[in-house]
Design a protein with these regions (language model features):
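Short acidic/glycine-rich loops and adjacent helix/strand connectors
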Residues: 1-173
Length: 173
């Protein structure tokens, strides 16, 4: 399985080719444009500037990654939420256009799950020791999650939000 991953949730424009075979996740290629210098003079991220810079840079990044490589991927994954609305629209629009042109499924990815499951990159999924606790620190979305096998029988109160995702049970603590 191979995906073109598109991330434009805030002030970095990132595209990657990520593959999985027999539980091994590999980043084949990643290119990114950081907007830090443009935003520093304002003392923080300016949403309108961020989305404009995504629009200006994403096609050049895609071309550097190699348009012909899109034919190799099984699907296109794109960050959906949370994030800056204008920035997210740029990524979703490019993903939708590429999906339509190359006849590839576009898979929305919840931004925070991207952080949580980045632990799988360059590893075999079988090497993960569950249960585990993960701290995410991403802008205003700083949380602690308990990750268990999806089949885990837990005694936890139901007042904690829970999700099942990619074969894992996730509890926000």
């Amino acid at each position: 399985m191979k995906t073109l991953a598109i991330e434009t949730s805030c002030d970095d424009t990132s595209l990657a080719i990520v593959s999985e075979e027999n539980g091994n996740f590999q980043v084949e290629d990643i290119l990114a444009y950081s907007q830090i210098q443009e935003h520093q003079k304002f003392g923080g991220v300016v949403p309108e500037l961020a989305s404009r810079l995504h629009s200006e840079k994403i096609i050049a990044i895609l071309q550097s990654l190699g348009l012909e490589r899109i034919k190799e991927v099984d699907f296109i994954s794109v960050t959906t939420e949370p994030g800056l609305p204008g920035s997210l629209v740029v990524g979703k629009t490019v993903a939708s256009l590429l999906g339509e042109f190359y006849q590839k499924e576009v898979v929305p990815v919840y931004h925070i799950w991207g952080h949580v499951f980045s632990i799988l990159l360059e590893r075999n999924i079988q090497d993960l020791k569950l249960p585990m606790v993960i701290l995410t620190a991403s802008g205003g979305h700083n949380d602690i999650y308990l990750i268990e096998d999806q089949s885990a029988q837990t005694q936890k109160k139901s007042d904690f939000p829970q999700w099942e995702y990619a074969g894992f049970k996730i509890t926000k603590l």
